[in-house]
Amino acid sequence: GMLATAKHFPGHGDTETDSHKTLPSISFSKDRINKIELYPFKELIKNNLDGIMTAHLNIPSLDKKNISTLSKKIINDLLIEDLKFNGLVITDALDMKAIVDFSEGEHPDITALNAGNDLLLMPENIDKSFKEIKKAYKKNKISEKRLMTAVKKLLSAKYKSGLKNIKPIQTENIVEDLNQDIDFALLDKLAEESITAVKNSNNNIPFNISSEESIGYISFGDDSNMIFYDYLNMYDRVDHLNKLNNDSLIQKVNSYSKIIIGLHKSDSSPFNDYKFTDEEVQIIEKIKDNNITLVIFAKPYSLMDIEIEGIDSILVAYQNSNVFQKKAAQAIFGAIDVKGVLPVTINKKIPVNTSIEIKKKKS
């Protein structure tokens, strides 16, 4: 079975740095945190949430001294006592820089346990952590009550998730079992439903297939674009212009009636860069009056660097996998409906819930 876990308590969404690399700070007042950051946790706790993962943050309004994961004020007093959460409290990884480089005093794993955490995730050195916790317990630095509370909650979570009846997974044909036609059909549908138009001036999309139209394609980013390009060419001839140097590229664009630009960024890791380069932004700025359709195969936040005035159409495909490249090409030529809804705010011109519906062409 599975246990539903919310993260990262008390709220990691409005930070500018990554706790894998440093210690982020939240400077909001206690009142603001209570009204905004804590709201989703309160609602989930009302519905018997199984677990909560803590955040590695500096939050002076809640605790001037301790990192939030190591803070008794934040974990025990706020989460467990004030919010009445009695589920499993799990630390974020304890080998992250926010803990390794910024924790002070006693061993952080001991401090985390005493703060009210039940499960210590990924200590930097497990053997050392075990020995330090055992030593602290013998010296009464960790109480019997705190240790037993954590153990009982862990055993309860294991029982609830069915680990008492665990059976070895049969690995024969496991790849085939996990990759069935019904799964690919669902992925195809999810990709199709998610393609989002955030701009479509003069009903530029869907493209009309015509011998009078000439279409050029420019690919930006560090990842493959071939599926997108191949699918575009299934509908009409599309020339790939990237072999030209930038000056020649800008000149060549003028000979086409439509230009498609694709930002293809690798999504192999959530920490990969998703932004346009400065050079790519400059190219877009110079050619954006040439009937441009911009397709984002990356996080929609990449649009924050782009001035959208002058660009005719913008599609957000969210990731650069083959199925999303295929669906984006189909959307451009009207083979599918476009009805996705933007889940985040980019700026005032592209707010959350932006959704321009584009009907597919009638066959």
Where do the language-model regions lie?
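Second-shell residues forming the walls of enzyme active-site clefts
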Residues: G1-R146, K153
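Preference for extracellular/luminal or secreted protein segments
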Residues: E81, S103-S363
